[in-house]
Amino acid sequence: MTASTSSTPSTSTKIPSSSKSSVTKQTKQKRNERERKRVDQVNQGFVLLQERVPKAAGNKAKLSKVETLREAARYIQELQKQLGMSSTSFHNSMPADFPTPEQSPVYPQSVCSMMAQTPSPSYTSPYYPPPQMMSSNQHDMSSHYYQESSSSSASTSGDHHSFYSHTETY
């Protein structure tokens, strides 16, 4: 008895159903693993952000992701206010007098004390030489560059800072 074959050319190249399902299973497993890894990375990022954003004095509960983002936005706005930065001056100029973390009322005191106790690492790398003091000639050239770039960016600013200037009250 002879086996009947279909007249369509695709039947000769068909993958057996058992190997087809294993390919599909492997593909699904890989896709699921990538998604789990992505979700884990997002969650780790939120944990780090929650650790860095100061909480209100009475709020000891863990913040949700949305609350964490809102608090981070408020914290950034507060820091900008303390630095005297408006949305337009944020990119065009930097104030000369920055408050230290100890002077900041919103900066977590535990971090301040931890930073004071932790010695600065002495990092050396053959790829990145240590910073060197600028000569007065180099300083003059760099300050001239920044003056030109800030004036040119101010004249061509248009509306590309509108994302940063949009503030919402939460």
Curated annotation (Swiss-Prot):
The phenotype of cells or organisms lacking this gene is: Egg-laying defective. Reduced expression of the tryptophan hydroxylase tph-1 which leads to reduced production of the neurotransmitter serotonin in the hermaphrodite-specific motor neurons (HSN). Inappropriate lateral projection of HSN axons. Lack of netrin receptor unc-40 expression in a subset of HSN and VC motor neurons. RNAi-mediated knockdown prevents cell death of a subset of the serotonergic neurosecretory motor (NSM) neuron sister cells, and survival of NSM sister cells is increased in an hlh-2 mutant background.
Q: Which organism is it from?
A: Caenorhabditis elegans
What name does UniProt use for this protein?
A: Helix-loop-helix protein 3
| Region feature Disordered, mapped onto this chain | 1-42, 118-170
One annotated GO molecular function is: protein heterodimerization activity
Which Pfam families does the record cross-reference, listed alphabetically? HLH (PF00010)
List, as start-end ranges, the regions of compositional bias called Low complexity: 1-26, 143-157
User: What are the record keywords, sorted?
Assistant: Apoptosis, Differentiation, DNA-binding, Neurogenesis, Nucleus, Serotonin biosynthesis, Transcription, Transcription regulation
A Gene Ontology biological process annotation? positive regulation of programmed cell death
Cysteine-cysteine disulfides: none
